[in-house]
């Protein structure tokens, strides 16, 4: 199958450092290629270029990974059209972002949710169950060095940007033998705590 994955066009794919959505698209790209699919990543802010590239490429399927580009869906000549919103508060959006549900519902594309809870929220808002699927996300474990015996079997580590919505500060206060790696943007997170290892490069994390 010939598949197009469409990114936001702000960061490179794969990203040079952090970039959750960009890593996700890259992992999808690699996994689909392993399955024998012909996969192209289109990563630009130029909407006309996206439409022309997809229509000229005669793709069997397209998966749009940026909700703000939903209005181009009707102009795509493709049998299978899918769209995913990566807005982090989609399960409980602020009032100014509830429009995203109608935007995706009326896009004409099949909605791919990142979790069961997000799918349930779409259904609660009147979107037909046949037009919503769930595609769980994760990491490519083959890219990480995994030791057979853990150096610290009684500890876990949370990797990622530290921010209020992810509630690392809450976990930190529970003293649950959890370490944290990532750049901090949460004033309630205690960066002097010995469980905080600061920001590390992606390569260091994969190698260690």
What are these regions (language model features)?
Residues 1-44, 57:
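N-terminal subdomain of nucleotide-sugar transferases
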Residues 9-11, 159-164, 184, 200:
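Short donor-sugar binding/catalytic loops of nucleotide-sugar-dependent glycosyltransferases
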Residues 62-63, 107-116:
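A short beta-strand/loop micro-motif in the catalytic core of glycosyltransferases
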Residues 64-69, 85:
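Short His-centered aromatic/hydrophobic patch
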Residues 89, 93-111:
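Membrane-proximal helix-turn-helix segments that form the acceptor-binding/catalytic region
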Residues 112, 149-166, 170-179:
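Conserved donor-binding/catalytic core segment of Leloir-type glycosyltransferases
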Residues 117, 138:
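Carbohydrate-associated surface elements
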Residues 183-184, 192-208:
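Conserved active-site histidine-acidic residue motif and adjacent donor-binding/catalytic loop
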């Amino acid at each position: 199958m010939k598949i197009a994955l469409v990114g936001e066009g702000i960061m490179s794919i794969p990203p040079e450092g952090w970039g959750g959505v960009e890593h996700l698209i890259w992992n999808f790209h690699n996994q689909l290629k392993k399955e024998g699919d012909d996969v192209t990543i289109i990563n630009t802010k130029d909407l006309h270029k996206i439409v022309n590239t997809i229509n000229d490429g005669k793709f069997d399927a397209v998966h749009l990974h940026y909700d703000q580009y939903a209005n181009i869906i009707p102009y795509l000549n493709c049998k299978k059209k899918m769209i995913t919103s990566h807005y982090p508060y989609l399960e409980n959006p602020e009032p100014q972002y509830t429009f995203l549900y109608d935007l995706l519902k009326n896009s004409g594309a099949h909605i791919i949710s990142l979790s069961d809870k997000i799918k349930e929220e779409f259904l609660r808002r009147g979107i037909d169950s046949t037009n919503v699927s769930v595609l769980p996300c994760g990491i490519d474990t083959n890219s990480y060095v995994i030791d057979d015996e853990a150096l610290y079997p009684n500890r876990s580590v949370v990797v990622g940007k530290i921010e209020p919505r992810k509630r690392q500060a809450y976990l930190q206060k529970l003293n649950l033998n959890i370490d944290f790696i990532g750049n901090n943007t949460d004033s309630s997170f205690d960066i002097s705590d010995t469980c905080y290892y600061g920001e590390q490069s992606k390569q260091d994390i994969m190698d260690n």
